[in-house]
Amino acid sequence: MTAGTTTGTTVGDRAAIALLALSGRALPLLREWVGGDPGCGVARGLLTLATGDRMADSVLKEQLALAHRDARTAGEREASLVYGVFLHTHRQYRLTADHLVTHFERWPADELAGLMIGAFSACEDAAYRALGDTLVERQAALAGPDNWPWTGWLASARAEQGRVREAHDLAERALARYPRSGVAVHALAHAEHELGTGPASTAFLDRWLTADPGAVQVRHLSWHAALQSIACGDFEDARRRADAALPRQDVGMRAATNWRLLLVGQEPAGRSDPEHVRELLTAPGGTAEVFHTFNLALALAVEAATDDLEQLARRAAADPRPDYRDVLAPVVRTLAALTTGRPRAAADELEALGEKAERIGGVRVEREIVQDTLARALVDAGEHVRAADLLHHRTSTRRHHAYEDRLLTARTPAAAAGPG
């Protein structure tokens, strides 16, 4: 496919465009591509990239071996691309990032390689995130402003850097070029969260998702719409959206929604099964990534499972990994303190943590819940002025901030005993 194209004459072109757009048509088209051209290593590699997390290890290994063999026959770029897929599907994110740097030196602005750009942030390392941002900036400049995939990725980078207006403009530019760009609409959702756009954002997301209900990000974008409803104080709509879009086993986004609701004294949406949460924590991948573990902790906090939280905090404090020991442990202790009505202790934990809280993982919109938690703890501890200062940048710049106003509202002693 040519750079920034919006249509394709071959099934391969259409599949690549759908995958770049995170369309619900991507998987059927990729399967059609592989079925019609089983010797195309890139086709098989991209299908494996899209579905590898659901494959058994033996199947994953077999598909990647076939893809790389055929890609080597096609050429060096194809072989390099599939090798990147091999690294990415094996969660070797640092190696993936290092490989992408070399790949882009040889094949600048390669859109299909851009599908793996998330490896830089997945490294959970500030230096790699910065390297990824620099790489995206360079590739977007080389690709030009009419290239919707790279403009969308640049919009995402700008949103995460807090350059919200620029992110918004870039996302709109990408969507003007290709209205079905899932990357661009996701970047727009992040920007509009920080702008407090409210009903205008939810209406746009509803229209966009109606056109492709099978879109890859349907649940995540529905979650963004629920957050906009929370921002406006329409808590019933937030619950409705969460229950309609998020299955009970989707612990992370459901917990992040429910904890926000509880922080402002509202009933949560449907909850996750606590036993399922405990099973996830004890599973081999339960503490593999700090942000995943944090989301499980939020789910426990929603249930006021103080004993589980304290046990998890001790486990994190004994972990040799700095982000677990120095960041996750105090955050989990904060949640435990709030569930037992000890806001002063909770506030002390988070204030001592300071900017290190950024290392909890996730993106800005997701990490904001840590600040929400500190604001609630400060208000419940009688520190309203400090809480207001903490949220001033939000209440003074967001069009809709009913949620922040609720966070800054003192609760009755009974309600202040803790979320849950």
Predicted segments with their positions:
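Canonical positions in the second alpha-helix
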Residues: 32-33, 67-70, 102-103, 135-139, ...
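Residue-level detector of the short coil/turn that links helix A to helix B
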Residues: 55, 91, 125-127, 162, ...
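Inter-helical turn/loop elements of alpha-helical hairpins
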Residues: 2-4, 9-75, 86-94, 120-130, ...
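Generic helix N-cap/helix-start motif at coil->alpha-helix transitions
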Residues: 6-11, 38-42, 74-80, 107-114, ...
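Single-residue signature of alpha-solenoid repeat helices
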Residues: 26, 60, 96, 128-132, ...
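Internal metal/ion-chelating core segments
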Residues: 134-232
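Helix-coil-helix junctions within alpha-helical repeat/solenoid scaffolds
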Residues: 227-420
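Residue at a conserved register position within TPR or TPR-like alpha-solenoid repeats
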Residues: 18, 51, 87, 120-122, ...
